[in-house]
Curated annotation (Swiss-Prot):
Residues 61-82, 89-115 have a biased composition (Acidic residues). This is Anaphase-promoting complex subunit 15. Residues 57-119 are annotated as: Disordered. One of its GO terms (biological process) is anaphase-promoting complex-dependent catabolic process. It holds the Pfam family Apc15p. It comes from Schizosaccharomyces pombe (strain 972 / ATCC 24843). GO terms for cellular component: anaphase-promoting complex; cytosol; nucleus. The gene is apc15.
Amino acid sequence: MSFMSLMANTAHQLWYPTSFPSMKELEKEEVRLETQELAIKQFGFRTIRPIGLNRSMQEQLDLEEQEREEANQDTELDEEELGSGSFPEEGEMDDMDGDNEEVEDHDIEEVDLDADITNADASEFYEDISEYGFQN
């Protein structure tokens, strides 16, 4: 038997098997492939860091969950404050507003931000505007 005939015979057996797998074997192979695919997806989800992000997708989800829990704790604290009646009365709120209006900062010196820009109204361009027939 020559090498070419052996290769042809082997290829034929690979592509056209004499016995076909049973349904159980096919289902078992399908489950194996699905678990392998899931493992690959989860591996990437836990370890690969996308470009521009400093954490993996799993780390990002964990961080978002932690932030949600902190926000829930903050809302629980706010609800406790509502129940305790620690907020000021209406008259007290008016007093607080009056205090804010009286505050003035005299220590802050105003800075002209466009001091180095020439004023267009004072430039030489507009001095001889009557030459061009424009009226003010």
